[in-house]
């Protein structure tokens, strides 16, 4: 227990505080952008900061599992934060993604994952699955999913996303998504194939191909989850996917 003198010193400590007036939305935007090390936040980081919808939580949960954070929890002590960070080369803590399926197959690069582009991929896929009016993939749709826009269309889109989750259940959605993800991973790993090279050809110099992965994922999701079909001949399927 602190002495009375120490407690008094702490209580009398003066903090440097700046005050200014602004609108509530502007203040929220300022706090969304604050970070401890001056890093410029990516578009997806800005979208998810402060967004508490069921959709954003579902995207975060699926992305976290796929990224490899098996110790994920909504509540964590500050001394354990480094354990859920993507580690830098040579460090013995955090999540090592150098051998991740996305990176090995040039679906998403390591820097892009650090910018949460893997969350964008999940959000685009879920948005397409959930919505009757199929959205295009890109910033405009993602901004709408995460709360931007007050038009009737934007509000209806977010309502439909939330209703889909409540109707089908978050756990079921997560399990279905992971089932398809793991199926694609096993198909390419078991056949010693690289996703980018197999889909785009060996001559491709593209460092990433998230949209092609999204197309394959959604096709399998439709057949396996929605139509309850099974993959009978893996080799023929793989051949059909080839360039």
Model-derived features with residue positions:
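Basic- and aromatic-enriched surface patches that contact anionic nucleotides/nucleic acids
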Residues: 1-137
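C-terminal subdomains that position terminal phosphate/3'-OH groups for nucleotidyl transfer/ligation
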Residues: 119-243
